[in-house]
Amino acid sequence: MLLTLPNLLSPADLLAARALLSAAPWADGRATAGIQAAQVKNNEQLPSDCEATRAIQAMVMKGLDGSPVFFSAALPKKMFPPRINRYGGDSNFYGNHVDNAIRAVPNSPQRVRTDISCTVFLNDPGDYDGGELTIADTYGEQRVKLPAGHAVLYPGTSLHQVRPVTRGHRLACFFWIESLVRGDDQRRLLYELDMNLLRLRERHGETAETTALTGTYHNLLRMWADT
């Protein structure tokens, strides 16, 4: 399931994030890639322990905490701490790859299974040319280039790339989620059921049917979830 989360970050958050990034200590992004991905990765990334990274991580986590749609779609169990990257100049693309299935959290014994990938765009599409996040799925190739503050969720199993940036710089935050429900098809069904229950309640209030369907939702979640 590919899903857009509009306005995850506020204009004030974005202004503060870009001010931090203007003086940030960018490093070669290949240092954090797997063996296969490092061969096609050519971007810059912030160290995980720098001030700008920690501040933007806090902004993103606050935005996620305030997004019921994120929780409905992702059903998060664990999350890899958000990272920040930049594309432009001589470090301007990331070729086709699939993310590592398991990521080790820095300075922690924790491991995160990468069921879902998330990218949060930190500057507007007009600031740069190219830089589309291109995701291959069963419906064909999806190209994603969203306004600043918007985010996209997509399956971690997807073959994807970032197209070359030919003007300006593309700034983004990215991370992975281990879901309570491992299968993308199952998460999609639960999300669609949850969203339609919400619409039914908005239109008709609580009824015997919405109560019964809510029970169905939770019984499916109980059947599929791994805690």
Swiss-Prot record:
One of its GO terms (molecular function) is 2-oxoglutarate-dependent dioxygenase activity. Fe cation binds at residues 97, 99, 160. InterPro entries: Oxoglu/Fe-dep_dioxygenase_dom (IPR005123), PKHD_C (IPR041097), PKHD_hydroxylase (IPR023550), Pro_4_hyd_alph (IPR006620), Pro_4_hyd_alph_FE2OG_OXY (IPR044862). Residues 78-179 form the Fe2OG dioxygenase domain. One of its GO terms (biological process) is DNA damage response. Binds 1 Fe(2+) ion per subunit. 2-oxoglutarate binds at residue 170. It comes from the Bacteria. PANTHER family: PKHD-TYPE HYDROXYLASE YBIX. This is PKHD-type hydroxylase Pnap_2559. It comes from Polaromonas naphthalenivorans (strain CJ2).
